[in-house]
Amino acid sequence: MLDSLKQKKNFKRIKMRIKTGDLVKVINGKEKGKTGEVLKTIPLENRVVVKGVNLRTKHVKPSQEGESGRILTEEASLHASNVMFFSKDKNLISKIEYFIDKEGVKKRRLKKTGELID
């Protein structure tokens, strides 16, 4: 799928404000209301994988004789527009904005409260 995306004429890599390790809350879809940590971001598809959210079961056949098959449960990706950054301290969701501090370092903060993220 990534190859087909790269071959499109107007293909653009989407810049994501959500990073790996951020705590997010699902705001849309069947998993709405759940919170979790971002395990992986996929910028080419504008998707994120969140720990404990959007679980899928995968049936794995035995690869060798004598080995039994398994049923694995793993997280599937969500579209990045369906999640928002979640502040555990204030217990609210907010958009993220970038700014440059006095030392000239680019940082992230919450738009609603101004709380620094990193």
Swiss-Prot record:
Database matches in NCBIfam families: rplX_bact (TIGR01079)
Domain of life: Bacteria
Disulphide connectivity of cysteines: none
GO BP term, pick one: translation
Keyword RNA-binding in record: yes
UniProt key word DNA-binding: no
SUPFAM superfamilies: Translation proteins SH3-like domain (SSF50104)
A single GO cellular-component term on record: ribonucleoprotein complex
Protein task: One of two assembly initiator proteins, it binds directly to the 5'-end of the 23S rRNA, where it nucleates assembly of the 50S subunit. One of the proteins that surrounds the polypeptide exit tunnel on the outside of the subunit.
Recorded GO MF terms: rRNA binding; structural constituent of ribosome
PANTHER family, alphabetized: MITOCHONDRIAL RIBOSOMAL PROTEIN L24 (PTHR12903)
Protein encoded by which gene: rplX
Complexes and interactors: Part of the 50S ribosomal subunit.
UniProt keyword annotations, A-Z: Ribonucleoprotein, Ribosomal protein, RNA-binding, rRNA-binding
Protein known as: Large ribosomal subunit protein uL24
HAMAP family: Ribosomal_uL24_B (MF_01326_B)
A matching Pfam family: KOW
Family label: Belongs to the universal ribosomal protein uL24 family.
Species of provenance: Prochlorococcus marinus subsp. pastoris (strain CCMP1986 / NIES-2087 / MED4)
InterPro entries in the record: KOW, Rib_uL2_dom2, Ribosomal_uL24, Ribosomal_uL24_CS, Ribosomal_uL24_KOW, Translation_prot_SH3-like_sf
